[in-house]
């Protein structure tokens, strides 16, 4: 049998429908692929072989039809998405043995689509980090170069897809945690509009910013995955009651007349020359396809990082109060009294970066500093939203780099939090405004992928996919493969 692990979702679907392969065949090959490459990559925290094989057998018995495009397709799940009977750790010692008794809403949708979860993917602890180096369990490697980070916090989700361990994965994005690792690994990653995908069962980091989204190796696959996981959920108070279009319906390659904005702030100081060049070339590609691309200004972007880290850390300090050593999660044995249970369980259960964010958030919310920090950050957030609204009054989309540079070395920035935080500078404004954003492959610098970020209007992922697909068809970046997937050096 030919190798299946680098095929698209559409190709796999055709093979399954024609009965050239079964869901059991595909799941077995996926599990073998994970086993063969996991030592090199470290993408998975848990592999759920028995459950995956049982599900594959049941799906084969039921039969796979043309009308169910994702039936029998294996999928990897970021380990902050709650999965019944599969350990869910959020990359933390605090939850190292947490076995949930319910599924997140996105998992319900995955099962409704007859997809097959094969395991839980490594991530920065509680999604706090940009390199997947803060995980309690292991350090994930970049699919293109195992001496480089895969990005974060959804590093496992990106590395696994780029290396062909799974054809699709779910990640979460609070300040760039889908788009940045997608860029670093040369794949497609989409953060949907806030409210498009249910957050019920997502272990919260910053509730006003978090959003679940798909990572795939091409645009159409990504649209298929978003079709499956989108929709209103009464269990999530921030879920939006908007209709879900078929995101694959308009992937024609025709974007004549589309108006695209390129903010000058996104190509400024700190952006690597090769990254800047790739974005400018992408702008020329869009022009050649019949779109107009014009320079605009998003003047408050430069305050995005400061506002984001105050808001996100403040929300995290509140959300993480629940991990106290009493109800569930890690409990210290080094205790004499109740106070020791709280203090020692949290001190021993949380890693350095999580503690740093809790401290920053608690400080920002404290009585003497609330107005100067948290309140002011909220006001800056409003200004950033207004900047986007002003541009979107005249344009359909905004483009720019996903990250200022390509992937950096393992260990290079782990002890320099400010440098690490600055890698989010181009992605956090999108979360602050609740907009959809995606990263698609757009070039290379010294053999490492460059990501192009596409930002859309609220609930207009449809137009983003349309433009991304047109760009993909006009270029060949998405066809390039890392060595681990059979590509050339």
Curated annotation (Swiss-Prot):
Question: What molecular functions are annotated in GO for this chain?
Answer: ATP binding; glutaminyl-tRNA synthase (glutamine-hydrolyzing) activity
* Tree of life domain: Bacteria
Concerning PROSITE patterns, the annotation shows: AMIDASES (PS00571)
Alphabetically sorted, this entry's keywords are: ATP-binding, Ligase, Nucleotide-binding, Protein biosynthesis
Known EC number: 6.3.5.7
Q: Does the keyword ATP-binding apply?
A: yes
> Where does this protein have coiled-coil stretches?
none
- GO CC term (a single one): glutamyl-tRNA(Gln) amidotransferase complex
Q: Which GO terms describe its biological process?
A: translation
In the record, the note on similarity to other proteins reads: Belongs to the amidase family. GatA subfamily.
- Stated name of the protein: Glutamyl-tRNA(Gln) amidotransferase subunit A
Q: Which organism is it from?
A: Enterococcus faecalis (strain ATCC 700802 / V583)
């Amino acid at each position: 049998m030919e190798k299946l692990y680098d095929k698209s979702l559409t190709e796999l679907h055709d093979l399954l429908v024609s009965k050239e392969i079964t869901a059991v065949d595909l799941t077995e090959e996926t599990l073998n692929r994970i086993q063969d490459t996991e030592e090199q990559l470290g993408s998975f925290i848990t592999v759920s072989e028995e459950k995956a094989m049982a599900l594959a057998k049941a799906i084969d018995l039921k039969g796979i039809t043309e009308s169910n495009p994702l039936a029998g397709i294996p999928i990897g799940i970021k380990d902050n998405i709650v999965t019944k009977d599969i350990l869910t750790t959020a990359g933390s010692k605090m939850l190292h043995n947490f076995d949930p008794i319910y599924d997140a809403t996105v998992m319900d949708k995955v099962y409704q689509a007859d997809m097959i979860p094969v395991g839980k993917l490594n991530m920065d602890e509680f999604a706090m980090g940009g390199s997947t180096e803060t995980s309690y369990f292991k350090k994930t490697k970049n699919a293109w170069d195992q001496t480089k980070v895969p990005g974060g916090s959804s590093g496992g989700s990106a590395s696994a897809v780029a290396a062909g361990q799974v054809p699709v994965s779910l990640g979460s994005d609070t300040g760039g945690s889908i788009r940045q690792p997608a860029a670093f690994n040369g794949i497609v990653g989409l953060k949907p509009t806030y409210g498009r995908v249910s957050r019920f069962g997502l272990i919260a980091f910053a509730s006003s910013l978090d959003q679940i989204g798909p990572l795939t190796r091409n645009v159409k696959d990504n649209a298929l995955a978003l079709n499956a996981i989108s929709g209103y959920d009464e269990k999530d108070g921030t879920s939006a009651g908007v209709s879900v279009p078929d995101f694959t319906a308009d992937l024609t390659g025709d974007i004549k007349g589309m108006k695209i904005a390129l903010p000058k702030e996104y190509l400024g100081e700190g952006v690597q020359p090769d990254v800047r060049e790739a974005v400018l070339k992408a702008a020329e590609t869009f022009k050649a396809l019949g779109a107009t691309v014009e320079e605009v200004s998003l003047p408050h972007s430069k305050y995005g990082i400061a506002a984001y880290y105050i808001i996100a850390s403040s929300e995290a300090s509140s959300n993480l109060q629940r991990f106290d050593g009493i109800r569930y999660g890690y409990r210290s044995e080094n205790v004499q009294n109740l106070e020791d249970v709280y203090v020692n369980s949290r001190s021993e259960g949380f890693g350095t970066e999580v503690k740093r964010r809790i401290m920053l958030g608690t400080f920002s919310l404290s009585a003497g500093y609330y107005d100067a920090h948290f309140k002011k950050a909220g006001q800056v957030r409003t200004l950033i939203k207004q900047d986007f609204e002003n541009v979107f009054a005249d344009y359909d989309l905004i483009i720019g780099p996903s990250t200022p540079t390509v992937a950096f070395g393992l260990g290079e920035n782990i002890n320099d939090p400010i440098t690490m935080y600055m890698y989010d500078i181009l992605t956090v404004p999108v979360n602050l405004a609740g907009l959809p954003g995606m990263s698609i492959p757009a070039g290379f610098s010294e053999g490492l992928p460059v990501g192009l970020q596409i930002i859309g209007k609220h609930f207009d992922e449809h137009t983003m996919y349309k433009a991304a697909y047109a760009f993909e068809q006009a270029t060949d970046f998405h066809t390039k493969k890392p060595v681990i997937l059979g590509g050339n050096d």
